[in-house]
Amino acid sequence: MQEQYRPEEIESKVQLHWDEKRTFEVTEDESKEKYYCLSMLPYPSGRLHMGHVRNYTIGDVVARYQRMLGKNVLQPIGWDAFGLPAEGAAVKNNTAPAPWTYDNIAYMKNQLKTLGFGYDWSREIATCTPEYYRWEQKFFTELYKKGLVYKKTSAVNWCPNDQTVLANEQVIDGCCWRCDTKVERKEIPQWFIKITAYADELLRDLDKLDHWPDTVKTMQRNWIGRSEGVEITFDVKGYDNTLTVYTTRPDTFMGATYLAVAAGHPLAQKAAANNAELAAFIDECRNTKVAEAEMATMEKKGVDTGYKAIHPLTGEEIPVWAANFVLMEYGTGAVMAVPGHDQRDYEFASKYGLTIKPVILAADGSEPDLSEQALTEKGVLFNSGEFDGLAFEAAFNAIADKLAEKGVGERKVNYRLRDWGVSRQRYWGAPIPMVTLEDGTVLPTPEDQLPVILPEDVVMDGITSPIKADPEWAKTTVNGMPALRETDTFDTFMESSWYYARYTCPQYQEGMLDSKAANYWLPVDIYIGGIEHAIMHLLYFRFFHKLMRDAGMVTSDEPAKQLLCQGMVLADAFYYVGENGERNWVSPVDAIVERDEKGRIVKAKDAAGHELVYTGMSKMSKSKNNGIDPQVMVERYGADTVRLFMMFASPADMTLEWQESGVEGANRFIKRVWKLVYEHTAKGPVAALNVDALSEDQKALRRDVHKTIAKVTDDIGRRQTFNTAIAAIMELMNKLAKAPQEGEQDRALLQEALQAVVRMLNPFTPHVCFTLWQELGGEGDIDNAPWPVADEQAMVENTTLVVVQVNGKVRGKITVPVDATEEQVRERAGQEHLVAKYLDGVTVRKVIYVPGKLLNLVVG
């Protein structure tokens, strides 16, 4: 064994061994308990960042630990390879998205291997290959036949200059990110999957997810947004159709003083024909894309359409306004307004001088004061005719019943959740497998024409999708009739919604999934990824699992038993102000800092001498130039050090502050373990451990070893507090380093302890542990070694600590055998010099003894 720890030599050698032996390749084995450990698959952006490293290290620690428990562990990896960034990069680098993507995959795969992650590479998938997306296309056609897929027009962001659809992220201040043209809202036909058909089940089954974070479940509950209310129909004077609204507060119905419709509503469009102000307002709304999140804070605007609706219970005429806070794509595109009891309606009514009618009493029973704001709390009705005096629930039911009786209202459960629009007008995605005949008939692509392959050898102009720009690509025939292919591609959330299931059978050619393999491995036992995916990906992931279940492919209801959301990785951020007042962000690697006695940064400059402003720790990002390249750290310290720091610096679900001093500390610890094993093995063979022959000190040390095993097992396995597990191993190492190494049983005990330490560290630092296990004469490869088991007998305490008081004041602590009598404890206390001096020349008048805990001597 070399005296010096040299990670660069060890790590490449061990990685080669894993590759050659295919250590982490697994197959279904009914005789073993399975464990499926999955980290969210990466987008091949070009390089791994620290967020990736943290996510995958957590996954690898769990997988290696479970493997040592004797389970059949599947830990796969792949590439979420379609998406918009590839198109931008291709234009910038004058290439096509496919070669750019495949080059990135090759580079990042090498990076993952360098970090020593124990993946089953035989199951690697890239979602941009026809071998993968063909099954997604086939499944989509089956969902279409089941009535779960439909096409309808929907509003998108349209750049009139580039003649293309923009994602919300590509609209900057209402303009196209590329050419700065004013963006318009345009209705175009798009494909949707009916996720709303599963809304109730998606909501209900959240209760089954005991091992998912409550925050994620709450976010999904709110996103699905189930509400119970009443749908009410209004007649409108001089308009051919009725207006339908939905309300969760029918108790306030007698206070409805106006209706509001979306600018795109047919009623508003009709009224605009003779109303120039309204036409201009509709035009303005068309060109302002409003994210739902901004709705609450934006200025509420509207124009009177001139139409009057008839209140179904009072017969009163109430005005119908067009308003910018009503969205056509939500509900019916019309809302009833009760300004007395809804703040948004109140602000709008106050602005335009509309009637505000109170119908709910204040909590003290008085009429509410509406001079400043609406009264939004529930309460008792007044000003409501026959419903006066009713509280919320009774009023809800009475008014709902009355409306139903008159045929103008019905109770309804509504969801905030909208159907999933899966069409993207981009090139780099899986083609949507639908065709249109010359007579306009829309059909799914016949199975014998699947997959519809995306051409990869294309020229990108940065504006139009190559498959839209080439009219020949779309031409095909179906049953001998000419047809045109759909040129839209799937939303990339499609691929990431079922990849976890395909990992169970990536080579399977008979269909989307091999049910036998899928049902052996699924559900996923632990799924690890960022909380930013709480609603989009994690909802589609659950939805797709239910679709596959209903297609008979899987039997479980949910895709993953446990979800672990890792925290972000933060780093110091610095900038200097440039000549034009702009901020120039400087990498923390290039900042020369001065710290105070508490280690806080007080001054910083860069190599060019710029005075730097320190903004504190923030998420590693390109925009702040504060990302640390994992590659550089691995080259400097080794993969094991980077992994150990990642797991030790913070609990897995909390933010992690990147500190190179902490990385150095992790490196020093590994060197200490190496040094102790080196010194121990240099002394030659070790005798067998004879537990019965151990001295009290040796027993105490062995007790510490086994208590540590018990703690680390609990910390990793049950609590998943990996940082405290590492801290416990470090504490034990301190004791082992000070332990005597000369006697035969000292060395035998150290051998047992070091073999345990190396196995406990193996999930965190697998390369160095692989090597040290061999040096310690461990049986076989450590990858197949069992997890150490704590010896219950060794952990039994045979001594205990007793606090000694004289006249109620603590004067010392003594160690006594667990079974010591009161007499023996008193005798031992008298020998303790700190206690003895208080007993000199005095009489003990009374003794209070709490067995094994406290001895109080009352003297006079």
From Swiss-Prot:
Pfam families linked to this entry: Anticodon_1, tRNA-synt_1, tRNA-synt_1_2, tRNA-synt_1g
Residues reported to bind ATP: 622
PROSITE patterns assigned: AA_TRNA_LIGASE_I (PS00178)
Alphabetical UniProt keywords: Aminoacyl-tRNA synthetase, ATP-binding, Cytoplasm, Ligase, Nucleotide-binding, Protein biosynthesis
Motif segment ('KMSKS' region): 619-623
Catalytic reaction annotation: tRNA(Leu) + L-leucine + ATP = L-leucyl-tRNA(Leu) + AMP + diphosphate
Major location (coarse): cytoplasm
Catalytic activity, EC: 6.1.1.4
Xref: HAMAP family: Leu_tRNA_synth_B
Official protein name in the record: Leucine--tRNA ligase
Organism: Salmonella typhimurium (strain LT2 / SGSC1412 / ATCC 700720)
